Amino acid sequence: MMLTCQFNDGDTWLGLWLLCAFIVGMLGLLLMHYRAVQGDKHTKCKKCNKHNCNDDYVTMHYTTDGDYIYMN
């Protein structure tokens, strides 16, 4: 018995959609992980750095012992 893949088959298109959704989901998770790990080193907000900020919003600072400190 020989397995064939025809593009007029609904199961083939469903498999391709699921594969595409899986790849996009993995890329999204990697991007969120990168942004969470890198923190404020690569994220800019309103031209405001962690040393001089007059705006009222919460910034995330990374300390030397590996903890995040939330300040506003």
Swiss-Prot record:
Keyword annotations: Early protein
Q: Which InterPro entries match?
A: DUF5472 (IPR035154)
Pfam family of the protein (one): DUF5472
Give the protein name, as stated in the record: Probable protein E5B
